[in-house]
């Protein structure tokens, strides 16, 4: 949130905002609402997560689904679905993307942002 506020203050927050939690933990609806207040009417591309080793994975993805419904300016990029059944896209820890996974992740983002 602080980074978004700083970018906005400096006039550097662009019309398209890419948000990805990655594999780093929980977010709450209140935190997300605060973030969306700062972002305003900009187009937001929200990437959900695949972290099968963490119990919060499904909770976060459910929150992201809810937020994509709540806010018209959010496009959900479904990394969870795209990476399903693709163990070679991840390192041995089943969390961090492999080289192939990084290619697929980047391609998924590009397709959603550039070819809506």
PLM feature segments, named:
Residues 55-116:
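Catalytic His-Asp segment of secreted/periplasmic serine-dependent ester chemistry enzymes
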Residues 10-12, 39, 69-70:
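Extracellular/periplasmic catalytic domains that process cell-envelope and extracellular macromolecules
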Residues 33-41:
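Catalytic-core regions built around general acid/base machinery
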Residues 14-16, 41-45, 83, 97, ...:
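Functionally constrained cores in energy, signaling, and assembly domains
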Residues 1-34, 51-62:
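Conserved SGNH/GDSL esterase-like catalytic core that processes O-acyl groups on lipids
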Residues 15-21, 43-48, 75-78:
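Structural recognition of the beta-strand scaffold that forms the well-ordered cores
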